[in-house]
């Protein structure tokens, strides 16, 4: 199957997603279940599934939704979460992760989706897909639940590289704005630079330099720069894109996930406290379910590697079938919008 050459009987083009079946905490069964959920909702998705064929074939055969829509590529080796990226690159050419990326490199698939080791996935992606011309450091863009109309903000870098100088942060702003433009349909995304305060004199010298660089490039790149923002603005309405280095971004991401879990646990504990509180929970069930859906990390599952000659979506390692399906939905939307080509054009015009 070619990346966009397969056609459904209706005549509509089918977008092929390359899926790494191995490496996630839940194993290949959850990945295949997520694929089946996506296939049932969207007839325009096809898959190339990578992993040990002996394990994958029976799982796929059980899912009627996947009949005739999956090609299995036998890849016996599995990249584990504790494997060192440098070792994986040297010795992992028979792995499902390597094979999944190769399908994108060869043009057989439009996007790669993996739940595996983040460091190994990024290093493999950089080596096999290469960086876009002019990009210094690729970044991971993640979705953050927000009060904006699109219900999510974009934060990058989510952990691809703990280092980022002023030029890197400027490029993150450019790539993040392009992602928001294509993913959310925003004509002029608002971009903020994460700092310890909003005043222009605050923060490290490198951040102040990045502030000036982003401000100088905003108009030509069709985004609005709102200046420095603080951690409390991550879920807010001040901006649509938050730019930071990978260390800060990853700490913020994990803190947000932990806080969301704590809030959910405390709510369950409070509503189970007495018969009256249990009655209150029953009366508020619809509203609570709506709130849970808004902040459910599975709905925003999928960090996108930006700055490469190809699109890679990193799903959470602990993703269940719902989480995998969300990552595949994101991959389809990016493929449908020709995201990689549009991002490359934006970057080329800015350098």
Protein language model annotation of sequence segments:
Residues 29-30, 42-48, 54-57, 162-231, ...:
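Glycine-rich phosphate/diphosphate-binding loop of Rossmann-like nucleotide-binding domains
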């Amino acid at each position: 199957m070619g990346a966009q050459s397969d056609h459904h009987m209706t005549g509509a083009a089918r977008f092929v997603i390359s899926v790494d079946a191995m490496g996630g905490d839940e194993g290949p069964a959850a990945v295949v279940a997520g694929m089946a959920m996506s296939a049932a909702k969207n007839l325009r998705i096809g898959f190339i599934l990578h992993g040990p064929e002996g394990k994958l074939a029976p799982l796929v055969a059980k899912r009627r939704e996947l009949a005739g829509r999956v090609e299995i590529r036998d890849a016996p080796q599995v990249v584990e979460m504790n494997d060192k990226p440098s070792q994986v690159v040297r010795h992992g050419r028979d792995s499902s992760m390597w094979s999944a990326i190769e399908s994108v490199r060869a043009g057989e698939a439009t996007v790669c989706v993996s739940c595996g080791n983040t460091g190994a996935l990024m290093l493999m992606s950089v080596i096999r897909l290469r960086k876009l011309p002019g990009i210094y450091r690729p970044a991971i863009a993640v979705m953050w639940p927000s009060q904006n109309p699109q219900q999510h903000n974009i934060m990058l870098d989510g952990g691809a590289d703990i280092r980022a100088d002023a030029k890197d942060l400027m490029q993150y702003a450019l790539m993040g704005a392009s992602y928001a433009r294509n993913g959310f349909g925003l004509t002029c995304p608002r971009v903020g630079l994460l700092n310890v305060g909003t005043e222009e004199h605050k923060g490290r010298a490198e951040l102040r330099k990045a502030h000036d660089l982003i401000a100088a490039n905003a108009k030509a790149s069709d985004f609005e720069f709102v200046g420095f923002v603080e951690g409390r603005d991550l879920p807010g309405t001040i901006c649509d894109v938050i730019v930071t280095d990978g260390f800060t971004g990853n700490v913020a991401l994990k803190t947000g996930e932990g806080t969301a879990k704590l809030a959910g646990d405390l709510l369950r504990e409070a509503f189970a406290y007495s018969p009256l509180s249990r009655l209150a929970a029953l009366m508020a069930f619809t509203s609570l379910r709506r709130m849970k859906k808004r902040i459910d990390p599975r709905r925003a599952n999928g960090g996108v590697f930006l700055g490469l000659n190809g699109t890679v979506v990193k799903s959470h390692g602990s993703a269940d079938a719902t989480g995998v399906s969300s990552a595949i939905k994101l991959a389809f939307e990016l493929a449908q919008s020709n995201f990689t080509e549009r991002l490359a054009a934006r970057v080329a015009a800015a350098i």
